[in-house]
A protein has these predicted regions:
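Divalent metal-coordination and catalytic microenvironments
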Residues: 4, 26, 47, 88, ...
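Short internal beta-strands
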Residues: 20, 45-54, 134-136, 180-182
Length: 217
């Protein structure tokens, strides 16, 4: 995306980035490795994360201190400022967190919940009070991985609520004006045009995230 490309006019450093900070939902290795790609950030890279996530990623401090360094910031269940016009809060989940963002000027809200192992009461409330919902669409079924790799963990064991028997009907009833499945695993059949599974999702009024997707509130 052009807005995120380095070496913009007025930028400090040839490999600098307009990314002002990173919000981590958990300490998955995919997230940690992504932080290393931002090592040339100036000034220090700002990371918002739960205490458990920061503890699990202590090792990355010793790596990035030789480059940009890290400025850790705590997250809370109350709305806190992210920028002049955006506030956000944490929704605590088992083994992860979700984030709800709010445009302080328009009042519009967005929920980002890519790792949902359980539909908690707090998460249900956040879904029903958000204008846009980006929700965990990692797996279509509970045993999706075992079908291609015997012995693999189930969806719930990997902290993901499957679509078919978990989130589809729940999101169908959500009043959000846009609902989007994100964090899709490459085994998920909803990625393939023309599949029965994709049709079920689309008939429920739920979008399927794609590369380069932009959402305007």
């Amino acid at each position: 995306m052009p807005q995120l490309q380095p070496h913009r006019p007025g930028a400090v450093g040839l490999r600098n980035t307009p990314i002002a900070g990173v919000l981590l939902t958990n300490a998955d290795i995919d997230h940690a490795l992504g932080l290393l790609l931002l090592r040339e950030q100036e000034p220090p890279l700002v990371i918002y994360a739960a205490d458990e996530t920061r503890t699990a990623l202590e090792w990355i401090d010793s790596v990035l201190v030789k480059f940009s360094g890290i400025e850790w910031r705590k997250i809370t269940a109350e709305f806190q400022s992210l920028s002049d016009s955006i506030g956000f809060r944490m929704i605590k989940l088992p083994r992860s967190v979700a984030f709800q963002f709010r445009d302080t000027k328009s009042g519009a809200t967005v929920l980002f919940a890519p790792s949902v192992g359980k539909l908690t009461d707090e998460l249900r409330d956040a879904v029903h009070t958000s204008d846009v919902v980006l929700f965990d669409g990692t797996f279509w079924s509970e045993d999706e991985l075992t079908a291609v790799r015997p012995g693999a963990r189930s969806a719930h064991e990997m902290n993901h609520l499957p679509i078919r028997d978990g989130s589809l009907e729940f999101l169908r009833q959500s009043p959000a004006r846009r609902k989007v499945y994100t964090h899709l695993n490459n085994t998920n059949p909803i990625l393939m045009p023309g599949t029965r599974e994709r049709a079920h999702v689309e008939q429920a009024g739920i979008e399927i995230a794609r590369d380069g997707l932009e959402i305007v509130l």
